């Protein structure tokens, strides 16, 4: 696979992960709090915002949300 396709598919996976994260967050806390969650410091990410961590490692944020969905706060 050429480099352009790899970049395209990587970007699509990240966009898909963001959508899944938002869907799960809306189900857990409601639409009004989702934006606040993304931009507020979070202990799970050493007080970095989930937005900052997602930009570097979207799988880490998705995994954290999935553990929360299953009640592992």
Locate predicted features.
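Non-transmembrane "mature" sequence context
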Residues: 1-73
């Amino acid at each position: 696979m050429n480099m352009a396709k790899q970049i395209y598919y990587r970007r699509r996976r990240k966009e898909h992960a963001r959508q899944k994260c938002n869907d799960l967050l809306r189900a857990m806390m409601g639409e009004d709090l989702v934006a606040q969650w993304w931009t507020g410091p979070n202990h799970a990410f050493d007080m970095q915002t989930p937005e900052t961590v997602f930009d570097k490692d979207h799988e880490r944020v998705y995994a954290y949300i999935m553990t929360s969905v299953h009640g592992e706060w």
